[in-house]
Amino acid sequence: MPDLVPLPGSERTQLSNAQSAGQLNESETITVTLVLRRRARVPAALILGPETVTHEELDAQYGAETDDIALVTSTMTELGLTVTDTHQGSRRMMVSGTIAALSAAFGTTLTLVTSPQLGGTGQATHRYRSGGLSVPASLAGIVTAVLGLDDRPVARPQFRRLTAAAASRTVTPETVTPETVTPETVTPETVTPETVTPETVTPETVTPETVTPETVTPEAAPAAVPLTAVQVASLYDFPAGTDGTGQTIAIIELGGGYTKSDLDMYFSGLGLATPSVTAVGVDGASNSPGQPADGEVELDIQVAGAVAPKAAQLVYFADNTDQGFINAIAMAVHTTPPPTVVSISWGQSEDQWSEQSRTAMDGVFADAAALGVTVTVAAGDNGSSDDPNSTSGVHVDFPASSPHVLACGGTQLIGDLNTNTITSEVVWNELENNEGAGGGGVSDVFPLPSWQANVGVPTIAGSTSTGRGVPDVAGNADPVTGYLVVVDGKQQPIGGTSAVAPLWAGLIARLAQATGKKFGLLQPQIYGSVTEGAAAQGFNDITEGNNGAYSAGPGWDATTGLGSPSGQALLTHLSDPPPASTSTPTSTPTSTPTGKKPKRHWWQRL
């Protein structure tokens, strides 16, 4: 037995609902990921920008030490294990061996259990451990994380389907009346004062199948109805003359898949060519449609592609484990050339992660910032509790809580498509109906970043301490006003902050195209000199609603961050010098957004 010392931060929470699934085959060969220390800390000035480094510079200055890699390799070999791959820049080493040998090398005991799937139905069968790990004494301080021994699911997809009950609450006798629904505004054969009554507008008659482009039109009075991503981008005044040309959007998926037929059906319906979409397998995972997570995958690709149709997409598929998650992100960030932006719509309550997993993943996000790659992450769909089974307690979602990513919260967006104006935008909150709310709050583990120091981040609800505030930005997320997408050959409305991460990724691709810039960590540029209670340039300030423990108000808040985007104004703010076609940057209030009336296509008759 090797001389072992504890690995700090490797403790895993005990699963109270795990059930034994029989005997684990300890002779089975598996692969784990070791994360090594940096040769030097990435300077804050490099993370904050605007300067960036190349992959070669990052590897040489902030990657793993060559001597450390050699020592880990020799130590693993002495223990009967095999180093199968090494990535100096991302500081990862892949080590294979039998379960018995790996358990002995890292001081743990593994069992086989079943536990409930995260964000889905059914049970997952996986290896399981509780307590902490150890490492050979010679590697103390060199190996900072050992991932993959316990392969429990770690994240849930942050998307929500429109329910019949939710649809029936928005299209009611109070919102659709003889005064708003007339022969002049809607075809009398489809919707009339005689057909819209308390008896006809019910959860049984108003469903995702009945709320379609043929039944909901812009001529009707503005109401809470599903939209296309193109319409959302238009209401948010995404910069004219941009489409993502020359940019790459990387998308991280931990399950599910997409079909080309779904993409072709969706984009042809919008009058767009299907963008370049390439599936990239990580550690043996692959594009696997026919699973519950298909809705997540299709939503991400379709929203990003609709708002940035000329951007190339690389969709990374990995197993839903901490090992799979970090390997996918590292592969996306450290590819050559690096992507413009990485979109992540998966996460889990911050307290459910091991410290070593959070720290290792946050390190990759710091790499992204140094390389000029922006990372957009969904802030969660369960309000301030970040727990789908409870509204008590407060937690933020990780990886959205990392200070090196752009955390994306949720709103309910109602717009007048005739005038291309936002008529109402409030915090998304349907918690009382068990239908989700935008995540937000204050981190328990990440300190307050410098760029949030003056915006009024509160103390954690029920506490006297503060930390990194979540989210940074927001966008349309309520399934009632969500996004019409195609999944398994059927058009359906889907929402959740899962939609906001790719929406912002598409916007950033367009901003990068317009400015020729790599934005990296966007927050220093968008927070700038914003102070508590003040609106930020380039944003629609959301001031109504709450997500449970936190309420919206003027300026940054823990429900919608700085607000939803006012794209053209944001471009002006981020441009140096500003484009000739833009005006003085302003913070656009939600009641008076600007923008041209869009060209009308069939999909704008929603």
Language model features with spans:
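Long, low-complexity, intrinsically disordered segments
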Residues: 232-235, 239, 588-606
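Boundary/junction segments of secreted and surface-exposed precursor proteins
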Residues: 1-9, 582, 595-606
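Walker A/P-loop NTP-binding active-site region of P-loop NTPases
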Residues: 507
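Substrate-binding/charge-relay-adjacent region of secreted/lumenal peptidase catalytic domains
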Residues: 2-85, 94, 99-184, 189, ...
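Ser/Thr/Pro-rich low-complexity tandem-repeat tracts
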Residues: 172, 177, 215-217, 581-587, ...
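Non-catalytic alpha/beta scaffold blocks inside enzyme catalytic domains
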Residues: 395, 402-439
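A generic structural signal for beta-strand entry/edge sites
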Residues: 90-92
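An often Trp-containing, charged/polar helix-loop segment at the C-terminal end
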Residues: 412, 456-462, 512-558, 562, ...
